[in-house]
């Protein structure tokens, strides 16, 4: 029996360190296909086995056939000044494009990215927020299926509204091309949906959680579609570790209902995509560990739509897209007589393009508008309109250097304009070593809560401003790659809520600085074994007080050991977050202790003609006390088993 490649296997297509978007990857045996995204990353088509032939094609390039393997594929395009470029496969890894990790849980997907932290208010019932490089959760832009998840009320992106089944792989970019505006100071996290084979999944754990989902998917010559529906239930009774004691918390129950639909059509040189995602959450709000609440609850909903039409040209593409997001929340707490409702809607339309003028010049642009509406018992009814335009030019072989320059202009209806820029200069010293330097700016617009909260909203707020500089060096060898970087981020006009005596009000007062020294690396010890890891040292300061920034640890690190072979798949991962100040107080400061989060999973050899897959996992393997938000400890060690039954697995060999 041929060995099937796990559906988590990814690849990337690049051309002289530039990603190649919208290439088709076709399995010649099964006729199933995938399309690379705008960053050149693709998933291996479903049902692919070791030794299958994959055809890589895109207008403007000669079609190439390669043999599939379990090792993440890096496909590089070599340019020709006369003919269209020919696709060639390189055996080395790419230091410029670190292949994303995939995992069985939200924690695994997010924590596998360099410098990231996933902050949660306890278990599944708590809000989950991502942060990076010791920054705030509002400084990392999060996109799911190209849809901005930012809540315009508070500027945050609640990842607990996305069921694990929605999450395929994650990637982070530095927003060098300025495709994104407000809230992207620390970068942009792209969460890509996972294309699951048709079948059903059932997961259960010792904590009493139950997870059930059903999927259908298929692809034909010109189009593919997939749909899913499911439910996730957690009674919230699994004990947490706090002060070295196991404590069973009350009112942490969580019920989630979700559905999703995705269709992709390719016809000649046209691509079109449409997706719908929906989730409903009903959860208890347990409160702080030392001040529990057994009555509060929240019901929240999330509805997402994304549609795009893409025209591919030999030297680029033109893309038009429309996205819509609707998020609603009802919070009820009879103890404090609170019954609040919050509804936010946002619709965005944009046009983007990529054009390679010649072998040295590449031009990109991104233009669009968005409308945000909120209706809240605490904020009232408000609408914000914004439009934007960004443009960038990349120049290769510029006196031995590669140069990138980008600028962006955002215009808001409620406070004016914001201008940002981005520049990067890089050079190859040797075939295996390169250096680069970058600098740029970013901003964060005041949220509706900042502007209109009753009482205390301040409509005279200005946007926050940040400026960064970064120097890095990358080394690439036959089976490994490493990066060393130093980054400095300075921010001003930071919005801080201060007491007026009668109520709290936001003002632009604070300034801060962060210096981040980071090392990333990955090593392929064999075709089946890979080690990945990163570590960040962060030195931060609130310039108004001279103190270390709150919620900014000195150290963030992660490592992962992954092995795939003979139908088995296993990985062990560890994430470390250093201690951090929560509040400066007298006589002692309030702080969070260091966290060491560990996870182990084992995928057992599929049985019954590859139709039944079993995965065993252990979260918090070392059974450490975990707390990423002060007062909300997370679950102790837990065991889970996931069983999936996949349909239509038998494919005739040609």
Predicted regions and their residues:
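Short, acidic, small-residue-rich periplasmic hinge/interaction motif at the N-terminus
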Residues: 15, 24-28, 57-61, 69-108, ...
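Short acidic/polar hinge/loop motifs at secondary-structure boundaries
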Residues: 43-45, 147-174
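A beta-strand signature from Gram-negative outer-membrane beta-barrel systems
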Residues: 75, 161-201
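Flexible loop and strand-edge segments within Gram-negative outer membrane beta-barrel domains
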Residues: 234-240, 246-258, 269-348, 625
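C-terminal beta-signal and adjacent terminal beta-strands/loops
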Residues: 237-240, 490-492, 531, 576-583, ...
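Gram-negative outer-membrane beta-barrel transporters
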Residues: 488-490, 508-581
């Amino acid at each position: 029996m041929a060995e099937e490649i796990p559906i988590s296997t990814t690849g990337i297509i690049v051309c002289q360190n530039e990603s190649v978007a919208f290439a088709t990857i076709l399995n010649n045996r099964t006729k199933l296909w995938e399309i690379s995204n705008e960053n050149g990353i693709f998933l291996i088509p479903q049902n692919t086995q070791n030794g299958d032939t994959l055809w890589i094609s895109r207008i403007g390039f000669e079609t190439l056939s390669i043999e599939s393997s379990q090792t993440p594929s890096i496909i590089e395009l070599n340019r020709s000044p006369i003919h269209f470029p020919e696709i060639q496969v390189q055996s080395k890894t790419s230091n410029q494009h670190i292949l994303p990790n995939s995992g069985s849980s939200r924690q695994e997907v997010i924590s596998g990215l360099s410098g990231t932290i996933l902050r949660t208010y306890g278990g599944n019932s708590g809000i989950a927020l991502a942060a990076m490089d010791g920054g705030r959760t509002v400084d990392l832009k999060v996109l799911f299926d190209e849809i901005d998840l930012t809540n315009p009320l508070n500027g945050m992106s609640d990842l607990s509204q996305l069921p694990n089944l929605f999450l395929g792989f994650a990637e982070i970019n530095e927003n060098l091309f300025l495709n994104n505006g407000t809230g992207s100071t620390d970068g942009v996290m792209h969460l890509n949906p996972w294309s699951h084979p048709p079948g059903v999944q059932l997961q259960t754990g010792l904590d009493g959680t139950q997870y059930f989902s059903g999927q259908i998917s298929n692809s034909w010559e010109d189009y593919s579609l997939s749909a899913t529906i499911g439910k996730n239930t957690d009674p919230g009774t699994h004990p947490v570790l706090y002060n070295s004691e196991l404590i069973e918390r009350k009112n942490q129950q969580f019920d989630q209902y979700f559905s999703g639909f995705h269709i992709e059509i390719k016809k000649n040189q046209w691509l079109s995509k449409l997706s719908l995602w929906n989730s409903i959450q009903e959860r208890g709000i347990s409160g702080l560990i030392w001040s529990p609440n057994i009555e509060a609850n929240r019901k929240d909903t999330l509805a997402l739509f994304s549609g795009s039409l893409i025209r591919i040209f030999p030297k680029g593409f033109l893309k038009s897209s429309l996205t819509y997001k609707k998020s609603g929340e009802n919070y009820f707490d009879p103890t404090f007589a609170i019954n609040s409702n919050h509804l936010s809607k946002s619709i965005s339309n944009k046009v983007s393009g990529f054009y390679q003028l010649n072998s040295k010049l590449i031009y990109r642009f991104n233009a669009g508008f968005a409308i945000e509406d909120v209706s809240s018992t605490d904020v009232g009814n408000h609408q914000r309109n914004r439009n934007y335009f960004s443009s960038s030019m990349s120049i290769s072989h510029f006196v031995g250097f590669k140069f990138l320059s980008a600028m962006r202009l955002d215009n808001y209806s409620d406070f004016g304009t914001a201008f940002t820029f981005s520049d990067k200069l890089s050079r190859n010293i040797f075939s295996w070593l390169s250096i680069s330097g970058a600098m740029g700016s970013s901003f964060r617009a005041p949220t509706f809560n900042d502007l209109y909260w009753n009482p205390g909203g301040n409509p005279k707020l200005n946007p926050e401003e940040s400026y960064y500089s970064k120097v890095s060096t990358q080394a690439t060898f036959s089976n490994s790659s490493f990066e060393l970087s130093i980054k400095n981020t300075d921010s001003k006009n930071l919005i801080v809520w201060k007491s007026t005596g009668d109520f709290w009000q936001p003002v632009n007062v604070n300034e801060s600085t962060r210096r981040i020294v980071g090392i990333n690396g990955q090593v392929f010890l064999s075709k089946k074994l890979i080690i990945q890891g990163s570590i960040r040292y962060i030195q931060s300061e609130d310039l108004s007080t001279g103190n270390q920034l709150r919620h900014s640890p000195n150290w963030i690190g992660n490592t992962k050991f992954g092995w795939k072979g003979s139908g088995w798949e296993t990985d062990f991962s560890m994430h470390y977050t250093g201690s951090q100040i929560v509040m400066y107080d007298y006589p002692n400061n309030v702080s969070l202790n260091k966290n060491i989060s560990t996870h182990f999973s084992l995928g057992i050899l599929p049985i019954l003609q590859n139709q039944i897959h079993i995965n065993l996992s252990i979260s918090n393997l070392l059974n450490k006390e975990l707390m990423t938000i002060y007062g909300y400890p997370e679950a102790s060690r837990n065991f889970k088993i996931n069983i999936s039954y996949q349909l239509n697995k038998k494919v005739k060999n040609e």
